[in-house]
């Protein structure tokens, strides 16, 4: 049980996939202008990350390794991610049509979000990660992505009404803010011993 908590905390804070491993930067910068949109995408991405991590483990364990097809891992994982994203898109459209319209093109673009493929590949490469550990790591990666995305969106909303010098407006102040957030998350680096 302690190991599962360490995997979860490690994925959320210590090895945050956005601020420490620099995966998922496209939606991080692109969807963080409004907090409502950021929350919606964060929830959808967390769901996709968790489900894709578990499905990728099953594909790796019960299809690719027994049939000696490990060279098809990346293509297989992309296929699994595409199916999970389509399922998520149908679920969001059915449960919240407003959120579906607000997210627009960003929902199907979760398929190309490198954090989803990165988590699946890292889970496959980690020796000793079983089905539950892969799911917990995917869920933790989703929570870490959500935490960072929502915090960044809240800061960008505040920055939008602030008096920012002209050379720093737009992407420049966004990248500076992301860099400061990354420095703050580096403070968690010694929290869990490898």
Curated annotation (Swiss-Prot):
The processes (GO biological process) annotated in the record are:
electron transport chain
Compartment list: Cell inner membrane
UniProt-listed Enzyme Commission number(s):
7.-.-.-
What residues form the membrane-spanning segments? 4-24, 39-59, 72-92, 102-122, 135-155, 172-192
State the annotated membrane topology for this chain.
Multi-pass membrane protein
InterPro entries cross-referenced by the UniProt entry: Ion_transpt_RnfA/RsxA, NqrDE/RnfAE, NqrDE/RnfAE_oxidrdctase
Q: Listed GO cellular component terms?
A: plasma membrane
| Keyword tags | Cell inner membrane, Cell membrane, Electron transport, Membrane, Translocase, Transmembrane, Transmembrane helix, Transport
PANTHER family recorded = INTEGRAL MEMBRANE PROTEIN OF SOXR-REDUCING COMPLEX, ION-TRANSLOCATING OXIDOREDUCTASE COMPLEX SUBUNIT A
Q: Identify its protein family.
A: Belongs to the NqrDE/RnfAE family.
Summary of subunit composition and partner proteins = The complex is composed of six subunits: RnfA, RnfB, RnfC, RnfD, RnfE and RnfG.
Q: Tell me, what does this protein do in biology?
A: Part of a membrane-bound complex that couples electron transfer with translocation of ions across the membrane.
The protein in question is named Ion-translocating oxidoreductase complex subunit A
Which species expresses this protein natively?
Azotobacter vinelandii (strain DJ / ATCC BAA-1303)
What does the record give as the organism's lineage?
Bacteria, Pseudomonadati, Pseudomonadota, Gammaproteobacteria, Pseudomonadales
State which gene encodes it.
Answer: rnfA
